[in-house]
Amino acid sequence: MKKILIVEGNLKEENQDFIDAGIPTHTESLKESISYFTNNLDIDVANPSSDQDISEKVKDLNKYDGLIWGGSSLNIYNDTIEIRRQLDFMKECQKKIKKILAICWGMQVAVTAAGGLVKKCDKGSHRGIAYNIEINQYGANHQIYKDKQKKFNTPAFNFDEVVTVPESATILSSNQINNIQGLNFKINSSNVWGIQYHPEIPYEKMIRLIHFRKERLLEKKAFKSGDEIVTHVKSIEDEISNSNKELRMKELYNWINYLNEN
């Protein structure tokens, strides 16, 4: 049985707010999505920002066959102690874990730890959904997009984006808002598959997150008004009826297959 580590990107306070609101944490969503494909993985969870024993966990990273690093509401350029702890932990993971799937915030942490750059999006944001992600010629030949449609919509929630990739990185997909939606790079002993969007999170949770973060989103001017939120949520609800669960999660499925090779 393969052993993997899931890294929780949100602070424990944010996760407690999720729990109080009856919303699954990102780690819980990821575990549920993994279980759709397999129950034959031994899974540990770490939160570098909050775990007091994180230095002890660093010593044991060699025991993992793979790592999945999930989403967060943090902004990496804010350079807080909690964010620095995550970057330090990612650097250690990139030395010791061969197969890494970095999702949304996870991709931003992986890229930054490897010398790339993340900034606030210039062309807008994704608020529960990303439209028209296109797989390029490199992505079409990459295992992460095996059997994935060449243009697709997907759950997503991000206001920041990768603008400079690590040395030797290959961009795999993009859309009109983010030039880098998918990438692949190798560093030290790690092969990092990165995606800016969330195949592991259902649209229904994205809608709940929009309502949960309503005041924050209005303050950030992500939406002009409550009426715009209603209209936007309706468009996501329409997408639910058009989407296919297995196709939506194809990247996760393909990474699990990659994990189980050798």
Language model segments and positions:
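Cysteine-nucleophile active-site neighborhood
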Residues: 72-138
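Short glycine-/acidic-enriched loop or helix-start segments at secondary-structure transitions
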Residues: 16-17, 55, 78-79, 111-113, ...
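Pocket-forming structural segment of enzyme catalytic cores
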Residues: 9-11, 116-188, 192-204
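N-terminal beta1-alpha1 cap of cysteine-dependent amidohydrolase-like domains
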Residues: 1-88, 92-96, 220, 224-262
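Short, glycine/charged-enriched secondary-structure capping and boundary segments
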Residues: 19-22, 81-84, 114-118, 169-170, ...
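Short glycine/serine/threonine-biased micro-segments
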Residues: 64, 68-69, 100, 104, ...
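C-terminal and late-domain segments of enzyme folds
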Residues: 170-262
